[in-house]
């Protein structure tokens, strides 16, 4: 069974990533056959001042709500195509969490967008993508 971590952030690139994964699975390509999809959204920590003003339940609701919002389109696409997946919400440094979670799940590959929703989108290779490439020891597919 091929385990793939699909990293999404709610950006336009995330939609393309999910469409790419769907195509790989349905067309019997690289992921054809037996595949386990792990859809991952990582929320960066709020600034300390803001986080300290919130209690634990408020923080959990904030992170979970933001993650669900960012994953909504990706989840709908996968469900529409009847592709089984597990959704994971993580918190912290995005690139580090993606790589660490791929290791803990025993993933064979990571598929993610080449850019996210950052300020300089489209100008440079996204900083998260560049860091994941640097940290990961498994194959990574970047979707433009």
Q: For each of these PLM feature ranges, what is it?
A:
Residues 2-53:
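Small/aliphatic-rich secondary-structure junction motif
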Residues 38-40, 86-90, 141:
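General small-molecule cofactor/ligand-binding pocket signal
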Residues 57-69:
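A short acidic, glycine-rich active-site loop
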Residues 76-110:
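Structural beta-alpha unit
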Residues 112-134:
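Glycine-rich, Arg-bearing micro-motifs that act as flexible, cationic patches
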Residues 135-144:
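Short, flexible loop segments at boundaries between secondary-structure elements
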